A protein has these predicted regions:
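Compositionally biased terminal segments of proteins
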Residues: 1-153
């Protein structure tokens, strides 16, 4: 359960804050001012699902200013900053994956262009490690997860 003491059984991988790395990656991204909704396993974990968290899947709000913030934040967080596309390119891509010291962040950019209003409307801000993270509703997170997993098979 979110916020409980870490243990080997609860999926926190012994993290001292009690959060999986993917959840912490989303929290760090949230502190940068990037507007996004957390989806995928990290969102489901925060919603109380017993699910392993592999990474942070974030749907980025479309718009030039947010793309500029996203590019700057990802470049600051990335293990290889030169690999982060410029903001104008980000606005055209479907998915960008960035490796950080907190783990992998998948930026679902196309999903933001298609579903931002609905995802944002159904999402809630949840406290994570001292900051607020916009977290998708469980139904939305499950729907995106099943759609994305089906496409990747």
């Amino acid at each position: 359960m979110a916020g409980s003491a870490p243990s080997a059984e609860d999926g926190t991988n012994g993290d001292p804050a009690g959060y999986p790395a993917g959840v912490l990656a989303a929290a760090v991204l949230a502190t940068t001012g990037v507007s996004f909704v957390l989806v995928g396993s990290a969102a489901l974990w925060l919603r109380g699902e017993s699910i392993p968290v592999g990474d942070a899947d974030v749907v980025i709000e479309p718009g030039e200013q947010n793309m500029q913030r996203t590019r700057a934040a990802l470049a600051d967080l990335a293990l290889q900053p030169h690999a982060v596309p410029q903001a104008a390119r980000l606005a055209m891509l479907d998915i960008v994956t960035i490796m950080t010291s907190y783990g992998k962040i998948d930026c679902l950019l196309r999903r933001g262009r298609l579903d931002w209003e609905r995802l944002r409307k159904n999402a809630d801000v949840m406290p994570v490690a001292g900051t607020g993270v916009m977290v998708a509703a469980s139904a939305d997170a499950w729907r995106l997860r099943s759609r994305f997993k089906d496409v990747r098979r």
